[in-house]
């Protein structure tokens, strides 16, 4: 429970669930209020826990892509249900 309750984590998982893969800059643009430092920390934690994968292309500058693992997709489905239910209450 600690991981998903950490600020921005659910937002990141939900956003990653909306596409097959996404670059760091795209995530940051979508979540405009999150700092680069916090976003990087959350992505590292989610990767370490097996919820997301990370792919780095050796381009100049380096391009890094993120996506959900099967475990992450299960979590994203749960987050999506919560988001939809919350939207229905508003």
In which residue ranges do the predicted regions lie?
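Basic amphipathic alpha-helical segments that dock to polyanions
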Residues: 39, 43-46
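Basic, amphipathic "hinge/linker" alpha-helix immediately C-terminal to the N-terminal HTH DNA-binding motif
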Residues: 58-79
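N-terminal helix-turn-helix DNA-binding core of bacterial DNA-binding proteins
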Residues: 1-38, 59, 65
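Short, solvent-exposed amphipathic helices
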Residues: 74-90
């Amino acid at each position: 429970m600690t991981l998903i309750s950490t600020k921005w984590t659910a937002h990141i998982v939900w956003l990653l669930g909306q596409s097959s893969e996404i670059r760091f800059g795209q995530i940051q643009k979508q979540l405009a209020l999150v700092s680069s430092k916090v976003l990087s920390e959350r992505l590292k934690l989610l990767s370490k826990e097996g919820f997301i994968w990370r792919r780095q292309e050796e381009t100049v500058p380096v391009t890094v892509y993120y996506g959900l693992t099967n475990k992450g997709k299960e979590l994203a489905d749960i987050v999506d249900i919560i988001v939809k239910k919350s939207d229905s209450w508003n």
